[in-house]
Swiss-Prot record:
Species: Streptococcus equi subsp. equi (strain 4047)
Cell compartment(s), UniProt: Cell membrane
Signal sequence region: none
Gene name of this polypeptide: ezrA
Gene Ontology annotations of biological process type: division septum assembly; septin ring assembly
Record-given protein name: Septation ring formation regulator EzrA
GO cellular component entries: plasma membrane; septin ring
């Protein structure tokens, strides 16, 4: 055998070995893929889809939800009965082809199975998602229905528990509840017939009506309590109190109180009847109006009761107060009569006393009897209170006026005594001023001083004449005394001024001698001032003339002389 043949045989053997090894490797890889596909198929088949289907089925779906569920359930049945069986068959075929080294067809089967598994996985995911959505929707719907039914059941329980608190509205409430029950029945019928949209609308309306009726029933008991308990109790209390007050001789400014009681009761009945319409705003407004009318009656009675207490108190005060004022008036009249014999009094005192008499007589004639028998009067105590209050205020005004008159007349004699004392002092002062001026040895007395002196003397004489009358006019005495006081003070001040100007002028005229010989201005002022001093007796003008001239040549000289004079000035000795 030639070497070429040997090499060919070896090559063929090697190729066979290599081909076998390659086949073994491919077969092993395909076995791995087939095993993986089998495991994947088992994992998909092992998903809890059946449990989820049974869970959704237990929800007893209806309508569109039930149709959707049936479609997805059928799809799962198709997958389990057909698709998984077909996949199993293709896996078995792939194993057989792989075992027989038919790798190309085996690979085709493996790819086919993988594609089918991908589709199955997508379908299962879609089925599970759809089941989850159906379950979630049904749970939401069930929760809504449960919530609405719970609201209604609570409303039923509340109404049943508080049935006695709804009064005339109970029939209307029961009617509204039957309407809500009908809406729930309509919801069930529509939902069962596969019309979820309209069923949801009906459920919404039923829930809204339940909530609204619940709110109404929460508010009604308070309104009914007012109409059936509070108002009747208050009216009974008012009527009982009214009868008791009448027995105690109370009278009222209004004569239709019984009619007002009846009108309020009719309003209560009318509002109770209207309440069946469940118009709560109107019912509350009417209740407020009724309460205001009841309150006005309470205020009326309380006002009269309070007035009675005030009248009872003032009825004791007024007689004593009147007697006190009359006593004061008598004393004042006696005092004025006594003083009138000696003095001419102001007409005001007499007029005031007459006015006081008139006020006191009016109270005595018209009010005193009322105060002493106030509980026998046929007038409301509030009116009696006004009468007594006015009278007591009048008495207070009279008393204040009496005090003013007393203050005016009590000092009359003192005014006369003081006026006489002052007159005596002023006459003495007038003489002392005259002597003071005479001792000054002036060239003459200024005319303005003489005028003031004689005016003051006349005023003192007028006061003296008034005090010498048989009946003294005390007002004139007071006025003249004030005038005399001011006149004496003015005369005293003028006296000091005249003497000061005269004395200082003499001193300055003498002092000016040191400048006259060489100051023409001083010489001229000297001559003019001397004339004013000796001829005209105008001492102030003379002082002004010479002091001005000296100030021009020796500033401050006048102030020096004035200061020196004030330190040594002689005072009038009164």
């Amino acid at each position: 055998m030639s070497s070429g043949i040997i090499l060919l045989i070896v090559a063929i053997v090697l190729l066979v070995i290599i081909a076998y090894l390659v086949g073994v490797i491919i077969r092993k890889r395909n076995d791995t893929l087939i095993t993986s596909l089998e495991e994947r198929k088992q994992a998909l088949f092992g998903l809890p889809v059946n449990d989820e289907i049974e869970e959704v089925k237990s929800l007893h779906l209806i309508g569109q939800s039930q149709t959707s569920f049936r479609e997805w359930n059928q799809k799962w049945v198709d997958l389990t009965l057909n698709t998984f069986t077909d996949i199993e068959k293709h896996i078995f075929e792939a194993e057989h082809l792989n075992d027989t080294f038919n790798f190309i067809r085996a690979k085709h089967e493996i790819n086919s199975v993988e594609s089918q598994l991908n589709l199955v996985e997508e379908d299962i995911t879609a089925i599970r998602e759809a089941l989850g959505i159906l379950k979630e929707q049904e749970e939401k719907n069930s929760a809504r229905v449960t919530h609405a039914l719970d609201l209604y059941e609570k409303l039923q329980a509340s109404v049943a528990e508080n049935e006695d608190n709804f009064g005339s509205t109970m029939a209307e409430i029961e009617k509204q509840m039957k309407n809500i029950e009908a809406e729930f029945s309509q919801f069930v019928a529509l939902n069962s017939s596969g019309d979820p949209v309209e069923a949801a609308e009906v459920l919404d309306k039923a829930e809204e009506h339940t909530i609204a009726l619940g709110q109404i029933t929460e508010q009604i008991p308070a309104i009914v309590a007012k109409l059936e308990d509070d108002f009747p109790d208050q009216l009974d209390d008012l009527e009982t109190g009214y009868r008791r007050l009448l027995e105690e001789n109370y009278h009222f400014p209004e004569k239709n109180i019984e009619a007002r009681f009846q009108e309020i009761r009719e309003s209560i009945r009318a509002n109770s009847s209207e309440l069946v319409t469940l118009d709560l705003d109107r019912a509350r407004d009417e209740n407020t109006h009724i309460q205001e009318r009841i309150d006005s009656l309470y205020e009326l009675f309380e006002r009269e009761i309070a007035a009675y207490k005030v009248v009872a108190k003032n009825s004791k005060i007024l007689p004593r107060y009147l007697a006190h004022a009359k006593h004061n008036n008598e004393q004042l009249k006696h005092e004025i009569a006594r003083l009138s014999r000696k003095y001419i009094l102001s007409e005001n005192e007499g007029l005031n006393i007459k006015a006081f008499d008139k006020d006191l007589k009016d109270i005595e004639d018209n009010v005193l009897e009322i105060a002493e028998a106030f509980d026998q009067q046929e007038k409301p105590f509030s009116e009696l209170q006004l009468i007594l209050d006015r009278s007591i205020k009048t008495l207070a005004s009279v008393e204040s006026g009496q005090m003013d008159v007393f203050a005016a007349v009590k000092d009359i004699e003192k005014i006369e005594s003081q006026a006489r004392q002052h007159l005596e002092i002023y006459v003495t002062q007038l003489h002392m001023i005259k002597r003071y001026m005479e001792k000054r040895n002036l060239p003459g007395i200024p005319q303005d001083f003489l005028s003031t002196f004689f005016t003051t003397s006349s005023q003192l004489e007028a006061l003296m004449d008034e005090l010498s009358r048989g009946r003294i006019n005390i007002e004139a005495v007071s006025r003249l005394s004030e005038v005399a006081t001011a006149a004496i003070a003015n005369l005293e001040e003028l006296t000091y001024q005249v003497v000061q100007h005269a004395t200082l002028t003499e001193q300055l005229l003498q002092y000016s001698n040191r400048y006259r010989s060489f100051e023409a201005g001083v010489q001229n002022s000297f001559e003019h001032a001397l004339k004013l001093f000796e001829v005209d007796n105008d001492y102030q003008a003379s002082f002004d003339e010479i002091s001005y001239a000296l100030e021009t040549v020796e500033p401050g000289v006048t102030e020096r002389f004035v200061n020196s004079y004030e330190k040594t000035r002689e005072r009038i000795r009164f």
